[in-house]
Protein backbone atom coordinates (compact mmCIF):
# COMPACT_ATOMS: atom_id res chain seq x y z
CA UNK A 1 0.00 0.00 0.00
CA UNK A 2 1.41 3.38 -0.93
CA UNK A 3 1.91 5.54 2.11
CA UNK A 4 1.28 8.82 0.40
CA UNK A 5 -2.15 10.32 0.93
CA UNK A 6 -4.18 12.87 -0.92
CA UNK A 7 -4.72 15.89 1.28
CA UNK A 8 -7.29 18.63 1.31
CA UNK A 9 -6.13 22.16 0.52
CA UNK A 10 -5.39 24.48 3.39
CA UNK A 11 -8.42 26.72 3.86
CA UNK A 12 -8.00 30.27 5.05
CA UNK A 13 -9.99 33.30 6.10
CA UNK A 14 -8.59 36.82 6.19
CA UNK A 15 -6.94 37.24 9.60
CA UNK A 16 -7.43 40.56 11.38
CA UNK A 17 -5.50 41.03 14.62
CA UNK A 18 -8.00 43.21 16.42
CA UNK A 19 -10.53 42.71 19.15
CA UNK A 20 -13.24 42.13 16.58
CA UNK A 21 -12.73 39.51 13.87
CA UNK A 22 -13.90 40.91 10.52
CA UNK A 23 -14.74 38.49 7.70
CA UNK A 24 -14.75 40.70 4.62
CA UNK A 25 -16.09 39.78 1.20
CA UNK A 26 -12.93 39.43 -0.83
CA UNK A 27 -10.90 36.79 -2.57
CA UNK A 28 -11.82 34.18 0.02
CA UNK A 29 -15.59 34.49 -0.56
CA UNK A 30 -15.59 34.78 -4.34
CA UNK A 31 -14.85 31.07 -4.88
CA UNK A 32 -17.67 30.18 -2.52
CA UNK A 33 -20.13 32.31 -4.45
CA UNK A 34 -18.81 30.77 -7.64
CA UNK A 35 -19.69 27.35 -6.29
CA UNK A 36 -23.25 28.44 -5.58
CA UNK A 37 -23.45 29.56 -9.21
CA UNK A 38 -22.25 26.17 -10.39
CA UNK A 39 -18.71 27.35 -11.12
CA UNK A 40 -15.62 25.49 -10.03
CA UNK A 41 -13.72 27.38 -7.29
CA UNK A 42 -10.39 28.76 -8.36
CA UNK A 43 -7.36 29.17 -6.13
CA UNK A 44 -5.26 32.35 -6.46
CA UNK A 45 -1.81 31.78 -7.93
CA UNK A 46 -0.24 33.15 -4.74
CA UNK A 47 -1.62 30.29 -2.68
CA UNK A 48 1.07 27.63 -2.08
CA UNK A 49 0.18 24.19 -3.39
CA UNK A 50 -1.04 21.90 -0.61
CA UNK A 51 1.70 19.62 0.67
CA UNK A 52 1.11 15.91 0.19
CA UNK A 53 2.62 13.29 2.45
CA UNK A 54 3.98 11.57 -0.67
CA UNK A 55 6.02 14.71 -1.42
CA UNK A 56 8.09 14.18 1.74
CA UNK A 57 10.92 11.67 1.67
CA UNK A 58 10.16 8.80 4.03
CA UNK A 59 13.01 6.58 5.28
CA UNK A 60 12.64 2.86 4.74
CA UNK A 61 10.45 1.37 7.43
CA UNK A 62 9.37 4.82 8.59
CA UNK A 63 6.77 4.62 11.37
CA UNK A 64 6.06 7.28 13.95
CA UNK A 65 5.16 6.27 17.47
CA UNK A 66 1.96 7.52 19.05
CA UNK A 67 3.48 8.28 22.44
CA UNK A 68 2.29 11.64 23.74
CA UNK A 69 4.61 14.22 25.34
CA UNK A 70 4.57 14.41 29.14
CA UNK A 71 5.73 16.81 31.83
CA UNK A 72 6.98 16.13 35.38
CA UNK A 73 4.59 16.20 38.32
CA UNK A 74 6.22 18.60 40.79
CA UNK A 75 4.17 17.46 43.78
CA UNK A 76 4.86 14.20 45.68
CA UNK A 77 1.26 14.04 46.93
CA UNK A 78 -0.49 11.34 44.82
CA UNK A 79 -3.70 13.38 45.01
CA UNK A 80 -2.15 16.52 43.52
CA UNK A 81 -1.05 17.09 39.94
CA UNK A 82 1.26 20.12 39.89
CA UNK A 83 2.97 21.06 36.65
CA UNK A 84 4.59 23.89 34.76
CA UNK A 85 3.28 24.86 31.33
CA UNK A 86 4.92 27.41 29.08
CA UNK A 87 3.44 28.66 25.84
CA UNK A 88 6.33 29.42 23.51
CA UNK A 89 7.44 29.31 19.89
CA UNK A 90 9.62 26.27 19.23
CA UNK A 91 10.91 24.31 16.26
CA UNK A 92 9.16 20.94 16.08
CA UNK A 93 9.33 18.12 13.55
CA UNK A 94 5.83 17.58 12.20
CA UNK A 95 6.97 16.38 8.78
CA UNK A 96 9.98 14.04 8.53
CA UNK A 97 13.24 15.97 8.35
CA UNK A 98 11.60 19.40 8.44
CA UNK A 99 11.38 21.92 11.29
CA UNK A 100 8.24 23.98 11.87
CA UNK A 101 8.29 27.11 14.10
CA UNK A 102 5.09 26.12 15.89
CA UNK A 103 3.36 27.66 18.88
CA UNK A 104 3.70 25.07 21.59
CA UNK A 105 3.11 24.12 25.19
CA UNK A 106 6.51 23.16 26.65
CA UNK A 107 8.05 22.95 23.21
CA UNK A 108 5.91 20.15 21.76
CA UNK A 109 2.89 19.69 19.47
CA UNK A 110 0.63 18.55 20.97
CA UNK A 111 1.39 19.82 24.45
CA UNK A 112 1.98 17.43 27.35
CA UNK A 113 -0.77 14.90 27.96
CA UNK A 114 -2.15 15.33 31.47
CA UNK A 115 -3.64 12.43 33.38
CA UNK A 116 -5.27 12.47 36.81
CA UNK A 117 -8.26 11.10 38.69
CA UNK A 118 -11.49 12.36 40.20
CA UNK A 119 -10.78 14.27 43.40
CA UNK A 120 -7.25 15.28 42.46
CA UNK A 121 -6.21 18.90 42.88
CA UNK A 122 -4.61 20.36 39.76
CA UNK A 123 -2.09 23.19 39.97
CA UNK A 124 -0.71 24.65 36.74
CA UNK A 125 2.03 27.27 36.83
CA UNK A 126 1.57 28.87 33.43
CA UNK A 127 3.98 31.23 31.69
CA UNK A 128 3.23 33.04 28.45
CA UNK A 129 6.36 33.38 26.30
CA UNK A 130 4.38 33.98 23.10
CA UNK A 131 4.59 37.33 21.30
CA UNK A 132 0.93 38.05 22.11
CA UNK A 133 -1.56 37.55 24.99
CA UNK A 134 -3.19 34.18 25.62
CA UNK A 135 -5.15 32.11 28.16
CA UNK A 136 -5.81 28.42 28.75
CA UNK A 137 -9.34 27.04 28.55
CA UNK A 138 -9.83 23.59 30.10
CA UNK A 139 -12.28 22.33 27.53
CA UNK A 140 -15.07 20.29 29.14
CA UNK A 141 -13.72 20.37 32.68
CA UNK A 142 -16.10 21.76 35.30
CA UNK A 143 -13.69 24.18 36.94
CA UNK A 144 -14.31 27.24 39.15
CA UNK A 145 -15.46 30.21 37.13
CA UNK A 146 -12.22 32.16 37.51
CA UNK A 147 -10.21 29.20 36.17
CA UNK A 148 -12.11 28.81 32.87
CA UNK A 149 -9.73 30.87 30.75
CA UNK A 150 -12.30 33.01 28.93
CA UNK A 151 -10.56 36.39 28.43
CA UNK A 152 -12.55 39.40 29.53
CA UNK A 153 -15.15 37.10 31.09
CA UNK A 154 -13.40 34.99 33.70
CA UNK A 155 -9.86 36.36 33.62
CA UNK A 156 -7.67 39.10 32.21
CA UNK A 157 -5.63 38.00 29.19
CA UNK A 158 -2.14 36.87 30.15
CA UNK A 159 0.23 39.27 28.43
CA UNK A 160 3.45 38.23 26.73
CA UNK A 161 5.97 37.54 29.49
CA UNK A 162 3.22 37.18 32.08
CA UNK A 163 2.17 34.22 34.19
CA UNK A 164 -0.94 32.79 35.83
CA UNK A 165 -1.67 30.03 38.34
CA UNK A 166 -4.58 27.76 37.43
CA UNK A 167 -5.87 25.67 40.33
CA UNK A 168 -8.95 23.47 40.63
CA UNK A 169 -10.23 20.08 41.79
CA UNK A 170 -11.32 17.45 39.29
CA UNK A 171 -14.95 16.36 39.66
CA UNK A 172 -15.71 14.26 36.57
CA UNK A 173 -14.09 11.42 34.66
CA UNK A 174 -13.78 11.81 30.92
CA UNK A 175 -11.63 12.81 27.97
CA UNK A 176 -10.85 16.52 27.92
CA UNK A 177 -8.34 18.89 26.35
CA UNK A 178 -6.85 22.33 26.83
CA UNK A 179 -6.29 25.18 24.38
CA UNK A 180 -6.14 29.00 24.18
CA UNK A 181 -9.29 31.09 24.23
CA UNK A 182 -7.84 34.34 22.90
CA UNK A 183 -7.28 34.69 19.15
CA UNK A 184 -8.04 31.00 19.45
CA UNK A 185 -8.37 30.10 15.77
CA UNK A 186 -4.87 31.37 15.05
CA UNK A 187 -3.26 30.06 18.24
CA UNK A 188 -4.84 26.60 18.01
CA UNK A 189 -3.99 26.50 14.31
CA UNK A 190 -0.33 27.08 15.14
CA UNK A 191 -0.14 24.16 17.56
CA UNK A 192 -1.46 25.13 21.00
CA UNK A 193 -3.49 22.19 22.33
CA UNK A 194 -3.07 19.19 24.60
CA UNK A 195 -5.01 16.21 25.99
CA UNK A 196 -6.30 15.76 29.55
CA UNK A 197 -7.69 12.40 30.72
CA UNK A 198 -9.50 12.12 34.06
CA UNK A 199 -10.10 8.63 35.42
CA UNK A 200 -12.57 7.33 37.99
CA UNK A 201 -10.81 5.09 40.56
CA UNK A 202 -14.16 3.46 41.35
CA UNK A 203 -14.66 2.33 37.75
CA UNK A 204 -13.15 -1.15 37.43
CA UNK A 205 -14.21 -1.77 33.83
CA UNK A 206 -11.34 -2.37 31.40
CA UNK A 207 -11.48 -2.27 27.63
CA UNK A 208 -8.08 -3.51 26.48
CA UNK A 209 -5.11 -1.34 25.54
CA UNK A 210 -5.93 2.35 25.97
CA UNK A 211 -4.71 5.01 23.58
CA UNK A 212 -5.40 8.73 23.32
CA UNK A 213 -5.67 9.92 19.71
CA UNK A 214 -5.50 13.70 19.49
CA UNK A 215 -6.52 14.68 15.95
CA UNK A 216 -5.44 18.05 14.60
CA UNK A 217 -4.36 19.79 11.41
CA UNK A 218 -1.96 22.56 10.43
CA UNK A 219 -1.35 24.63 7.32
CA UNK A 220 2.22 23.87 6.23
CA UNK A 221 4.11 24.65 3.03
CA UNK A 222 6.58 22.36 1.25
CA UNK A 223 9.34 23.44 3.66
CA UNK A 224 7.28 22.69 6.75
CA UNK A 225 6.66 26.38 7.45
CA UNK A 226 3.32 27.67 8.73
CA UNK A 227 1.19 29.11 5.98
CA UNK A 228 0.03 32.71 6.48
CA UNK A 229 -3.47 32.92 7.89
CA UNK A 230 -4.90 34.62 4.79
CA UNK A 231 -3.59 32.31 2.05
CA UNK A 232 -6.90 30.57 1.52
CA UNK A 233 -9.17 30.81 -1.45
CA UNK A 234 -11.17 27.60 -1.63
CA UNK A 235 -14.83 27.08 -0.89
CA UNK A 236 -13.86 25.76 2.51
CA UNK A 237 -13.46 29.27 3.92
CA UNK A 238 -17.05 29.58 5.06
CA UNK A 239 -16.67 26.30 6.90
CA UNK A 240 -13.71 27.66 8.87
CA UNK A 241 -10.02 27.16 8.23
CA UNK A 242 -8.67 23.65 7.86
CA UNK A 243 -4.94 23.00 7.80
CA UNK A 244 -3.84 20.84 4.90
CA UNK A 245 -1.62 18.59 7.02
CA UNK A 246 -3.61 16.16 9.17
CA UNK A 247 -1.87 15.05 12.38
CA UNK A 248 -2.44 12.21 14.83
CA UNK A 249 -0.69 12.94 18.13
CA UNK A 250 1.43 15.45 16.24
CA UNK A 251 2.50 12.95 13.56
CA UNK A 252 1.70 12.46 9.88
CA UNK A 253 0.60 8.89 9.16
CA UNK A 254 1.89 7.23 12.33
CA UNK A 255 1.80 3.45 12.63
CA UNK A 256 0.06 1.57 15.44
CA UNK A 257 1.08 -2.03 16.06
CA UNK A 258 -1.74 -4.24 17.37
CA UNK A 259 -2.39 -7.90 18.13
CA UNK A 260 -5.23 -9.77 16.47
CA UNK A 261 -8.04 -10.10 19.03
CA UNK A 262 -6.55 -7.65 21.57
CA UNK A 263 -9.08 -4.89 22.22
CA UNK A 264 -8.09 -1.26 21.73
CA UNK A 265 -9.80 1.56 23.61
CA UNK A 266 -9.38 4.85 21.78
CA UNK A 267 -10.03 8.20 23.44
CA UNK A 268 -10.36 10.48 20.41
CA UNK A 269 -10.10 14.27 20.64
CA UNK A 270 -10.87 16.62 17.75
CA UNK A 271 -8.52 19.54 18.40
CA UNK A 272 -8.95 21.21 15.01
CA UNK A 273 -10.33 24.65 14.30
CA UNK A 274 -12.94 23.44 11.83
CA UNK A 275 -12.38 19.92 10.44
CA UNK A 276 -15.06 17.27 10.95
CA UNK A 277 -13.67 13.75 11.32
CA UNK A 278 -15.77 10.86 10.02
CA UNK A 279 -13.56 7.90 10.96
CA UNK A 280 -13.75 4.47 9.37
CA UNK A 281 -11.64 1.32 9.59
CA UNK A 282 -11.98 -1.31 6.85
CA UNK A 283 -13.79 -4.49 7.87
CA UNK A 284 -14.13 -3.36 11.48
CA UNK A 285 -16.81 -1.86 13.63
CA UNK A 286 -16.42 0.28 16.73
CA UNK A 287 -18.19 -0.08 20.04
CA UNK A 288 -18.84 3.47 21.19
CA UNK A 289 -18.53 3.84 24.97
CA UNK A 290 -19.26 7.53 25.30
CA UNK A 291 -17.54 10.78 24.57
CA UNK A 292 -17.12 14.20 26.10
CA UNK A 293 -17.80 13.57 29.76
CA UNK A 294 -17.15 9.90 30.40
CA UNK A 295 -19.10 6.76 29.70
CA UNK A 296 -22.57 6.90 28.17
CA UNK A 297 -25.49 5.05 29.70
CA UNK A 298 -24.98 2.17 27.28
CA UNK A 299 -22.63 1.07 24.53
CA UNK A 300 -23.55 1.03 20.85
CA UNK A 301 -22.11 -0.62 17.76
CA UNK A 302 -21.17 1.78 14.97
CA UNK A 303 -19.24 1.50 11.72
CA UNK A 304 -17.97 5.06 11.75
CA UNK A 305 -17.23 7.70 14.37
CA UNK A 306 -18.09 11.32 13.62
CA UNK A 307 -16.13 13.68 15.86
CA UNK A 308 -16.74 17.40 15.34
CA UNK A 309 -14.40 20.25 16.39
CA UNK A 310 -14.01 20.30 20.18
CA UNK A 311 -15.86 17.00 20.59
CA UNK A 312 -14.48 13.70 21.90
CA UNK A 313 -15.31 10.05 21.29
CA UNK A 314 -14.53 7.02 23.45
CA UNK A 315 -14.64 3.76 21.51
CA UNK A 316 -13.30 0.20 21.37
CA UNK A 317 -12.32 -1.84 18.36
CA UNK A 318 -11.09 -5.41 18.28
CA UNK A 319 -8.43 -6.07 15.62
CA UNK A 320 -9.55 -8.93 13.40
CA UNK A 321 -6.81 -8.94 10.78
CA UNK A 322 -4.29 -11.76 10.49
CA UNK A 323 -0.71 -11.12 11.61
CA UNK A 324 1.24 -9.41 8.85
CA UNK A 325 -1.86 -7.57 7.64
CA UNK A 326 -2.01 -3.79 7.27
CA UNK A 327 -5.11 -1.66 7.77
CA UNK A 328 -5.73 2.07 7.61
CA UNK A 329 -7.88 4.42 9.67
CA UNK A 330 -9.38 6.92 7.25
CA UNK A 331 -11.45 10.02 7.62
CA UNK A 332 -14.21 10.38 5.08
CA UNK A 333 -15.64 13.79 4.08
CA UNK A 334 -19.02 14.24 5.73
CA UNK A 335 -21.82 16.45 4.48
CA UNK A 336 -22.11 19.57 6.64
CA UNK A 337 -23.47 22.16 4.25
CA UNK A 338 -23.10 23.42 0.70
CA UNK A 339 -20.02 21.98 -0.95
CA UNK A 340 -18.53 20.39 2.16
CA UNK A 341 -17.69 17.21 0.23
CA UNK A 342 -16.92 18.99 -3.05
CA UNK A 343 -13.71 17.74 -4.69
CA UNK A 344 -12.69 15.84 -1.56
CA UNK A 345 -12.01 12.16 -1.00
CA UNK A 346 -11.16 9.88 1.90
CA UNK A 347 -7.75 10.44 3.47
CA UNK A 348 -5.46 8.08 5.32
CA UNK A 349 -4.65 9.05 8.90
CA UNK A 350 -3.29 6.11 10.87
CA UNK A 351 -1.64 2.89 9.69
CA UNK A 352 -2.47 -0.21 11.73
CA UNK A 353 -0.15 -3.20 11.50
CA UNK A 354 -1.21 -6.52 13.02
CA UNK A 355 1.98 -8.10 14.34
CA UNK A 356 0.73 -11.13 16.32
CA UNK A 357 -2.26 -12.98 17.70
CA UNK A 358 -3.49 -12.07 21.16
CA UNK A 359 -3.26 -14.93 23.68
CA UNK A 360 -6.67 -14.20 25.20
CA UNK A 361 -10.27 -14.05 24.00
CA UNK A 362 -11.66 -10.48 23.96
CA UNK A 363 -13.89 -9.64 26.89
CA UNK A 364 -17.49 -8.82 25.93
CA UNK A 365 -18.36 -5.17 26.32
CA UNK A 366 -21.41 -4.69 28.55
CA UNK A 367 -24.50 -3.13 27.03
CA UNK A 368 -25.13 -1.05 30.15
CA UNK A 369 -22.14 1.09 31.12
CA UNK A 370 -23.39 3.36 33.89
CA UNK A 371 -26.53 4.86 35.38
CA UNK A 372 -27.37 8.37 34.19
CA UNK A 373 -30.49 10.03 35.51
CA UNK A 374 -32.39 11.95 32.87
CA UNK A 375 -32.86 15.57 33.92
CA UNK A 376 -36.38 16.48 35.02
CA UNK A 377 -37.47 19.30 32.73
CA UNK A 378 -41.10 19.52 33.89
CA UNK A 379 -40.73 23.07 35.20
CA UNK A 380 -37.65 24.04 33.24
CA UNK A 381 -37.20 27.46 31.67
CA UNK A 382 -37.37 27.24 27.87
CA UNK A 383 -35.01 29.21 25.63
CA UNK A 384 -34.38 29.33 21.89
CA UNK A 385 -30.93 30.13 20.53
CA UNK A 386 -30.75 30.46 16.75
CA UNK A 387 -27.31 30.31 15.14
CA UNK A 388 -27.21 32.92 12.37
CA UNK A 389 -25.02 34.14 9.51
CA UNK A 390 -25.48 37.46 7.69
CA UNK A 391 -23.51 38.26 4.52
CA UNK A 392 -23.28 41.85 3.30
CA UNK A 393 -20.01 43.80 2.96
CA UNK A 394 -18.66 41.44 5.61
CA UNK A 395 -19.68 38.13 7.12
CA UNK A 396 -21.26 38.56 10.55
CA UNK A 397 -22.23 35.54 12.58
CA UNK A 398 -24.26 35.55 15.75
CA UNK A 399 -26.90 34.05 18.00
CA UNK A 400 -30.49 35.15 17.43
CA UNK A 401 -29.23 37.51 14.73
CA UNK A 402 -26.89 39.40 17.06
CA UNK A 403 -23.07 39.08 17.03
CA UNK A 404 -21.32 38.53 20.34
CA UNK A 405 -20.09 42.08 20.79
CA UNK A 406 -23.66 43.41 20.57
CA UNK A 407 -25.47 40.75 22.56
CA UNK A 408 -26.77 40.79 26.11
CA UNK A 409 -26.07 37.86 28.44
CA UNK A 410 -28.57 35.15 29.21
CA UNK A 411 -29.30 35.28 32.93
CA UNK A 412 -30.32 32.36 35.10
CA UNK A 413 -30.23 31.33 38.76
CA UNK A 414 -28.03 28.84 40.52
CA UNK A 415 -29.89 25.53 40.80
CA UNK A 416 -32.17 26.17 37.81
CA UNK A 417 -32.84 23.61 35.09
CA UNK A 418 -33.32 24.91 31.57
CA UNK A 419 -34.14 23.54 28.13
CA UNK A 420 -32.29 25.17 25.26
CA UNK A 421 -33.58 24.78 21.71
CA UNK A 422 -30.60 25.29 19.39
CA UNK A 423 -31.82 26.19 15.90
CA UNK A 424 -29.56 26.12 12.85
CA UNK A 425 -31.18 27.44 9.69
CA UNK A 426 -27.84 28.34 8.14
CA UNK A 427 -26.25 26.47 5.25
CA UNK A 428 -23.46 25.15 7.48
CA UNK A 429 -23.30 22.77 10.43
CA UNK A 430 -22.13 24.12 13.79
CA UNK A 431 -20.69 22.26 16.82
CA UNK A 432 -22.25 23.96 19.87
CA UNK A 433 -20.07 24.16 23.02
CA UNK A 434 -21.14 25.24 26.52
CA UNK A 435 -18.55 26.23 29.12
CA UNK A 436 -18.86 25.22 32.76
CA UNK A 437 -21.74 22.73 32.57
CA UNK A 438 -22.75 19.41 31.04
CA UNK A 439 -25.99 18.95 29.11
CA UNK A 440 -28.16 16.11 27.84
CA UNK A 441 -29.49 16.03 24.28
CA UNK A 442 -33.26 15.55 24.41
CA UNK A 443 -33.62 12.94 21.69
CA UNK A 444 -35.03 9.50 22.41
CA UNK A 445 -33.07 8.05 19.48
CA UNK A 446 -29.75 9.01 21.05
CA UNK A 447 -27.89 7.15 23.75
CA UNK A 448 -28.16 9.13 26.99
CA UNK A 449 -24.87 10.76 27.97
CA UNK A 450 -23.42 13.95 29.37
CA UNK A 451 -21.92 16.31 26.81
CA UNK A 452 -20.43 19.77 26.50
CA UNK A 453 -20.09 19.87 22.69
CA UNK A 454 -22.64 18.67 20.13
CA UNK A 455 -23.05 19.08 16.40
CA UNK A 456 -26.12 20.95 15.14
CA UNK A 457 -26.43 19.94 11.48
CA UNK A 458 -27.38 22.44 8.81
CA UNK A 459 -31.12 23.16 8.58
CA UNK A 460 -31.93 21.38 11.83
CA UNK A 461 -32.37 21.91 15.54
CA UNK A 462 -31.45 20.15 18.78
CA UNK A 463 -32.93 20.44 22.26
CA UNK A 464 -30.58 20.39 25.25
CA UNK A 465 -31.35 20.08 28.96
CA UNK A 466 -28.91 21.57 31.45
CA UNK A 467 -28.92 22.10 35.21
CA UNK A 468 -26.89 24.97 36.63
CA UNK A 469 -26.13 23.15 39.84
CA UNK A 470 -23.03 25.02 41.05
CA UNK A 471 -20.20 27.40 40.06
CA UNK A 472 -22.04 30.71 39.60
CA UNK A 473 -20.54 33.35 37.36
CA UNK A 474 -20.24 34.29 33.70
CA UNK A 475 -19.77 31.46 31.19
CA UNK A 476 -19.45 31.34 27.43
CA UNK A 477 -21.33 29.33 24.82
CA UNK A 478 -20.34 29.31 21.16
CA UNK A 479 -19.84 27.48 17.90
CA UNK A 480 -16.59 25.51 18.15
CA UNK A 481 -15.64 26.20 14.57
CA UNK A 482 -13.27 28.79 15.95
CA UNK A 483 -13.52 31.19 13.01
CA UNK A 484 -17.31 31.19 13.45
CA UNK A 485 -16.97 32.01 17.15
CA UNK A 486 -14.58 34.86 16.38
CA UNK A 487 -16.97 36.15 13.72
CA UNK A 488 -19.64 36.53 16.43
CA UNK A 489 -21.34 33.15 16.90
CA UNK A 490 -21.08 33.07 20.68
CA UNK A 491 -22.72 34.47 23.77
CA UNK A 492 -22.47 34.78 27.53
CA UNK A 493 -24.45 33.01 30.23
CA UNK A 494 -24.63 34.66 33.66
CA UNK A 495 -25.49 32.24 36.49
CA UNK A 496 -26.42 34.25 39.57
CA UNK A 497 -26.32 33.00 43.14
CA UNK A 498 -29.32 34.48 45.04
CA UNK A 499 -27.33 34.22 48.27
CA UNK A 500 -24.55 36.47 46.96
CA UNK A 501 -24.42 40.06 45.87
CA UNK A 502 -25.19 40.51 42.19
CA UNK A 503 -22.03 40.58 40.13
CA UNK A 504 -21.50 42.91 37.21
CA UNK A 505 -20.85 41.17 33.93
CA UNK A 506 -17.60 42.24 32.24
CA UNK A 507 -17.91 43.92 28.87
CA UNK A 508 -17.41 41.27 26.17
CA UNK A 509 -14.13 41.16 24.28
CA UNK A 510 -14.52 40.74 20.54
CA UNK A 511 -11.81 38.20 19.80
CA UNK A 512 -11.77 34.83 21.53
Where are the regions a protein language model picked out?
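Extended terminal and domain-junction accessory segments
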Residues: 41-84, 188-220, 297-429, 467-474, ...
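Mature N-terminal segment immediately following signal peptide/propeptide cleavage
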Residues: 73-102
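C-terminal motif of bacterial Sec signal peptides marking the signal peptidase cleavage site
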Residues: 35-38
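Acidic-aromatic/histidine active-site loop/patch
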Residues: 209-262, 269-273, 390
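N-terminal edge beta-strand
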Residues: 92-118, 243-257, 392-417
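Extracytoplasmic beta-sandwich strand-turn segments characteristic of Greek-key/jelly-roll folds
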Residues: 109-116, 122-125, 138-172, 248, ...
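Hydrophobic or amphipathic alpha-helical targeting/insertion segments
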Residues: 43, 162, 166-203
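Asparagine-centered strand-capping/turn motif at beta-strand->loop junctions
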Residues: 126-130, 268-272, 422-426
